[in-house]
């Protein structure tokens, strides 16, 4: 639960420095592409004697030290938790929030949650955050700081029972009962057909009381739901071989 009235910025900074000193995970494309909370590439720029220089932080321990020193200075000079969060590598936004949450005010927590969720490519399948944790995050958030006024109005104006859609491919076909659905069937169709796949569109019913957020920042008409309250989940009628899902 997030109960702080004010953010403990020093606590957020300390947590961010801990993330900074985690190992850099190399990939098949390293040093060009790496995995780390504060960078997605092994190449970075640092200032040496007033001159910017490109260094490879995966190959030189001194270069890695210089880079971490530079990022530490940026963390320490930050004026807000959101500023520190924006320094993180996109795939690690939700991880940052997970570890920073007990230092954050409800307002900061809610604003970072909304941004991190939208920026993440596939937050429903984040291995660091089980569905129960993701759901508790949205349940703890303050709607007025989680959504824009237009988004709040859209959520408020929904019928008491809402039809929602979800498009899946072979990549996430086993995760139909996820938090993320859409009010727009065409959006679900796009998700089902991306990556040149012939995926599946599902539709379901859910009571509005079990919808925790509506996001339209990516024009996806996305709703965040409590999956256990989804009803009548079926393959969409326009797809072949309509069938019910049994759980």
Question: Language-model features: where?
Answer:
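Conserved NAD+-utilizing ADP-ribose enzyme module
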Residues: 1-163, 170-179, 185-246
């Amino acid at each position: 639960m997030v109960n702080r009235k004010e953010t403990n910025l020093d606590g957020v900074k300390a947590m961010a420095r801990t993330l900074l000193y985690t190992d850099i995970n190399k990939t098949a494309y390293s040093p060009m592409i790496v995995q780390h909370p504060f960078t997605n590439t092994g190449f970075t720029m640092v200032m040496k004697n007033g001159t910017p220089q490109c260094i490879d932080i995966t190959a030189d321990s001194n270069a890695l030290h210089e880079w971490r020193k530079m990022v530490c200075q940026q963390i320490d000079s930050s004026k807000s938790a959101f500023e520190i969060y924006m320094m993180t590598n996109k795939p690690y936004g939700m991880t940052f929030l997970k570890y920073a949450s007990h230092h954050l005010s409800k307002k900061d927590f809610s604003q970072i949650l909304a941004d991190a969720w939208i920026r993440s490519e596939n937050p429903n399948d984040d291995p660091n955050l089980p569905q129960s944790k993701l759901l508790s995050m949205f349940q703890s958030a303050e709607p007025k700081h989680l959504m824009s006024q237009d988004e709040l109005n859209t959520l408020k104006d929904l019928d008491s029972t809402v039809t929602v859609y979800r498009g899946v491919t072979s990549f996430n076909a086993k995760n139909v009962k996820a938090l993320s659905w859409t009010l727009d069937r065409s959006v679900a169709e796009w998700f089902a057909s991306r990556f040149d796949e012939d995926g599946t569109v599902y539709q379901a019913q859910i009571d509005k009381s079990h919808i925790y957020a509506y996001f339209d920042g990516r024009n996806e008409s996305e709703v965040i739901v409590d999956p256990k309250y989804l009803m009548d989940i079926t393959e969409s009628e326009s797809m072949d071989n309509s069938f019910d899902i049994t759980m």
